[in-house]
UniProtKB/Swiss-Prot annotation:
Domain remarks: The cysteine framework is XIV (C-C-C-C).
Keyword Signal (UniProt): yes
Keywords assigned: Amidation, Disulfide bond, Ion channel impairing toxin, Neurotoxin, Secreted, Signal, Toxin
The name this protein goes by in its record: Conotoxin Cal14.13b
Function: Probable neurotoxin with unknown target. Possibly targets ion channels.
Molecular function GO terms recorded: ion channel regulator activity; toxin activity
Main location: secreted
Tagged with keyword Secreted: yes
Originating species: Californiconus californicus (California cone)
PTM section of the record: Contains 2 disulfide bonds.
Amino acid sequence: MKLCVVIVLLMLAMPFNGGEASRFFNQHARSQRSGMKTRGIWCDPPCPEGETCRGGECSDEFNGDMGR
């Protein structure tokens, strides 16, 4: 009898836990995807080889001012 009650309680708890977890993972995946997307459209057209993209502008200094 006790085992049956435990199983029912677990089944009742699962949708809430699963919903929370999936919401967290979806949010995480969404932020990862949007991060990739913004990184891709920073410089259009892409910078020539040897230059890095910073805030939409191409720069050939690898360790220049990060605060710009």
